[in-house]
């Protein structure tokens, strides 16, 4: 369930990082109505782009989508160019695409800024769906929209890890659910269908701001608390805990960017270990915790030994699926590219060197 779709070593910034959008209670219903009326939905975007351009956009290549929309003025195409591709659109076209909110309203919400006679998005806003629900998710602009590596405070939108977790999560009705590392609230959108109360936590104030906006945009009640891992919910128990935590194994050497969405600041696979050892204290009897993670496999060891060590004394029953194994070079390449640093750049080689020597 929840088959969601969406279409250097120095500190990376895009100049001043754009402010997060505001959950204005007067303007959000207008935005919601305009997006729906424009068919700015997963299926609507697919129809605008066609399968080739939509597939390329999913692989973070925007040229085919640019070609498919460049000379179109229909509402859905204008919104794709504005919010998914990051191109400026004419102010008048934006007014026609958002007839209730208008371009001025998009600026007031913090979704866009004026750029001469054009409107340019300051965040990514895309449709998202599962088998029975449709939503919209705002997040920071991706590197394909900005042309720059990600800022360390970057807040992710809809990604493969998020949709994988959503597909695997047990969807039985629960009283209390915890979305640990809430990010842009993708998991909370799914939880709203079967949880009476949802608590979302994140160490990033920027992520919490996006979660607050997305909850309001999608008419979702969500309790948000700031803090690291399970610290903000000390003494609380839940029927279901879900988490796509910042699990990337990152070198703790100086100068390596610390992307908040993927790096918890712990050594090695410490974030996964901490969750395994502590999450049982926060589960109701019969409760379930489901999360993704990366872990180290020591040379010559069975990968299950590490999990047996972590689980010892927790009282938990565990089902651990090792989906993939990567050697150090493969792992370094994956996560050096993930921040938007391109192969061949000096910063890529430096990042690669740091990761491969973890």
Feature-to-residue mapping (PLM):
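Compositionally biased, low-complexity flexible segments
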Residues: 1-11
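N-terminal auxiliary segments of SAM/dcSAM-dependent transferases
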Residues: 18-139, 143-145
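SAM-dependent Rossmann-like transferase core, predominantly class I methyltransferases
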Residues: 115-177, 184-194
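Conserved SAM/SAH cofactor-binding pocket of Class I
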Residues: 159-243, 296
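Mobile active-site "lid"/loop adjacent to the S-adenosyl-L-methionine
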Residues: 243-274
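Conserved Class I SAM-dependent methyltransferase catalytic core
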Residues: 268-321
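Short, surface-exposed amphipathic charged segments that create phosphate/polyanion-binding patches used
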Residues: 329-345
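Conserved small/polar residues in nucleotide/adenosyl-binding loops
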Residues: 356-358
């Amino acid at each position: 369930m929840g088959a969601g779709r969406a279409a250097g070593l120095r500190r990376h910034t895009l100049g001043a990082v754009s402010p997060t959008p505001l959950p204005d209670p007067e303007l959000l219903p207008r935005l919601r109505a305009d997006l729906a009326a424009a068919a700015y939905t997963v299926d609507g975007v697919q129809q605008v782009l066609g399968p080739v351009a939509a597939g390329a956009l999913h692989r973070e290549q925007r040229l085919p989508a640019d070609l498919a929309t460049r000379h179109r003025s229909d509402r859905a195409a204008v919104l794709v160019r504005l919010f998914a591709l990051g191109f400026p659109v004419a102010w008048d076209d934006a007014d026609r695409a958002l007839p209730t909110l208008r371009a001025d309203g998009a600026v007031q919400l913090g979704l866009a800024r004026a750029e001469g006679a054009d409107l340019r998005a300051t965040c990514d806003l895309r449709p998202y769906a599962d088998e029975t629900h449709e939503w919209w998710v705002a997040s920071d602009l991706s590197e394909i929209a900005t042309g720059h590596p990600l800022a360390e405070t970057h807040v992710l939108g809809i990604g493969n890890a998020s949709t994988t977790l959503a597909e695997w999560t047990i969807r039985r009705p629960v009283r209390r659910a915890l979305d640990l590392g809430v990010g842009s609230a993708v998991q909370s959108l799914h939880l709203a269908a079967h949880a009476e109360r949802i608590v979302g936590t994140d160490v990033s104030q920027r992520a919490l701001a996006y979660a607050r906006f997305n909850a309001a945009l999608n008419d979702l009640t969500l309790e948000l608390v700031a803090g690291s891992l399970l610290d903000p919910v000390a003494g609380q128990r839940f029927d279901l805990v879900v988490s796509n935590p910042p699990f990337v194994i990152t070198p703790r050497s100086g100068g390596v960017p610390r992307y908040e969405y993927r790096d918890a600041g712990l050594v090695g696979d410490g974030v996964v270990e901490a969750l395994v050892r502590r999450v049982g204290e926060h589960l109701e009897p019969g409760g379930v915790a489901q999360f993704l993670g990366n872990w180290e496999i020591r040379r010559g060891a069975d990968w299950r030994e590490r999990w047996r060590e972590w689980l010892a004394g927790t009282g938990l029953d565990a089902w651990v699926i090792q989906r993939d194994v990567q050697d150090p070079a493969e792992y370094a390449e994956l996560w050096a590219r993930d921040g938007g640093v391109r192969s061949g750049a000096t910063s890529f080689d430096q990042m690669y060197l740091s990761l491969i020597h973890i």
